[in-house]
Amino acid sequence: MRYSRLFGKTQREIPSDAETISHQLLLRSGMIAQLTAGVYSFMPLAWRSIQKIENIIRQEMNKSGCQELAMPVLQPVEIWQQSGREAPFGQTLFHLKDRKDRNLVLGPTHEEVITDLASRYIQSYRDLPQRLYQIQTKFRDEPRPRGGLIRVREFIMKDMYSFDASPEGLDESYQTMKQAYENVYRRCGLESMVIDADSGAIGGKASHEFMIVAESGEDSIIYCPKCNYAANAEKAVFKKKTLPKEPPKDLEEVATPGQKTISEVAAFLSLKPENTLKAVFYMADGKFVMAVIRGDLDINEIKLKNLLKCNDLRLAEDSEVKAAGIAAGFASPVGLKNSLTVADDSVENGSNFVAGANKDGFHLKNVNFGRDFKADKMADIALAAEGAACPFCDGTFASKRGVEVGHIFKLGTFLSERFGANFTDAEGISHPIIMGCYGMGVGRLLAAAIEQNHDEKGIIWPMPIAPYQIYICGLFLDNPAVSQAAEKIYTELEAQGVEVLFDDRELTAGVKFNDADLLGIPLRLTISPRNLDKGGVELKLRRNKESELVPLESIMERVITCIKSQSDL
């Protein structure tokens, strides 16, 4: 491909609304173009990379015994009502009506459609197992699209669904897909981690996320370096600090003027944060909820939402807290009425805590769970953090940032029961089909690759998913020797099947080198009068600072060797 014919242009300035590195570089390199919030066009360079990612995915899916199909994006809302997932997805669903006033949605995922198909075409144990997948555009009305391709409203996704006759069959399908996903990321040249995850609105009994490790990632990964336990911070469990038990003392009100935060109160009263309690207020499906936790811990809102089994959970607004008769900054679980109280199990681990007095400028000393307040629900609702104790060994948690690029779930019979997707066994007895679902974000994977592979100059594409394998930079192309050598090398490389982007533009060396670094093509071949006078051309790997002079007669062999060494992942 000649650069002079390439559709799209690079930008020097960093777009003001681009927060993540991948968003900045995708826009600056002219690889994507925004149409509206969370909706992008893939320009030719990015689309070449997308196609390569999809090809790797297809190869691994097909190798794992999967069959590709295509399902409709337009779905009747009734199937979402039948599954019971219309409410959990809530405003994320794009709703529309057709000309006959029928309610439809744009598919954010396809569990409902595939289960409906299974109910029609799987009748016997002889029809099992089945593994079906598609690569298709999906739609989710994200409240805050951000991060370029990281969180969008229209996106490309590979979704696969497994159907088995037994839990053991599901386990086999699940492990097969887990390995296939790891193969995809490895072949794309990316470092990934498999971690325990929350199932969210998809549902199911177990799930794992696949994270591409990147400092700018939006997800927090909690892991134990000693035993290799790893989980999303939303899901992670940990060993909470044990406090000594003391005999309960009498409640005592103390003045704490202007001391509203846990750290302020602890310092003022010469306590440690773990000797305090804090109350956080939420609205859960419109119902007022107080969550109580030890002062050294934070609320995990995903755990809380799962415990309450609510579709919508948000922090209560100041007006809602005030209407409940609560003094903000001095809130107390003691004596509070007309609210659902949820306590983290840490409140049982300790005694004589300090908590708010629900009175401006005052706190209560010697607050004890059971005597002074009770909970309607008690569970682990604490957020794991770096430095927490691992519950599976004597290690201590560390943390990394990552971008989620895949999520797999053991659905079980959750959906098959609702859709009547049953099979008869060898004895003629009917059973619900046991399902799994497996999602992989293709656009997210593209963005994550950049988050993991870049420097201050631009993108550094892994060879397997680079738009082109080599960038030919012709300098002083008005020089006949340079233009002839460049054209000859370009033609011969293409004839060998090498993917070449030939910068044939009449621009300065500085502009061409800057664009080469920004676009991140893995190899750069520079043809200039000075190099030709030395009997060769300059070859440089984008990932390295050093370059080498390659004799003209050795170019083909050297380039192909470099491509192969960078592709064998």
UniProtKB/Swiss-Prot annotation:
Its EC number is 6.1.1.15. Keywords: Aminoacyl-tRNA synthetase, ATP-binding, Cytoplasm, Ligase, Nucleotide-binding, Protein biosynthesis. It comes from the Bacteria. It catalyses: tRNA(Pro) + L-proline + ATP = L-prolyl-tRNA(Pro) + AMP + diphosphate. The keyword ATP-binding applies. SUPFAM superfamilies: Class II aaRS ABD-related (SSF52954), Class II aaRS and biotin synthetases (SSF55681), YbaK/ProRS associated domain (SSF55826). Pfam families: HGTP_anticodon, tRNA-synt_2b, tRNA_edit. GO terms for biological process: prolyl-tRNA aminoacylation. Gene3D superfamilies: Anticodon-binding domain (3.40.50.800), Bira Bifunctional Protein, Domain 2 (3.30.930.10), YbaK/aminoacyl-tRNA synthetase-associated domain (3.90.960.10). Its main location: cytoplasm. It is found in: Cytoplasm. InterPro entries: aa-tRNA-synt_IIb, aa-tRNA-synth_II, aa-tRNA-synth_II/BPL/LPL, Anticodon-bd, Anticodon-bd_dom_sf, Pro-tRNA-ligase_IIa, Pro-tRNA-synth_IIa_bac-type, Pro-tRNA-Synthase_IIa_type1. GO terms for molecular function: aminoacyl-tRNA deacylase activity; ATP binding; proline-tRNA ligase activity. GO terms for cellular component: cytosol. Catalyzes the attachment of proline to tRNA(Pro) in a two-step reaction: proline is first activated by ATP to form Pro-AMP and then transferred to the acceptor end of tRNA(Pro). As ProRS can inadvertently accommodate and process non-cognate amino acids such as alanine and cysteine, to avoid such errors it has two additional distinct editing activities against alanine. One activity is designated as 'pretransfer' editing and involves the tRNA(Pro)-independent hydrolysis of activated Ala-AMP. Consists of three domains: the N-terminal catalytic domain, the editing domain and the C-terminal anticodon-binding domain. PANTHER family: MITOCHONDRIAL RIBOSOME PROTEIN L39/PROLYL-TRNA LIGASE FAMILY MEMBER, PROLINE--TRNA LIGASE. Homodimer. Belongs to the class-II aminoacyl-tRNA synthetase family. ProS type 1 subfamily. This is Proline--tRNA ligase. It comes from Dehalococcoides mccartyi (strain ATCC BAA-2266 / KCTC 15142 / 195) (Dehalococcoides ethenogenes (strain 195)). The lineage of its organism: Bacteria, Bacillati, Chloroflexota, Dehalococcoidia, Dehalococcoidales.
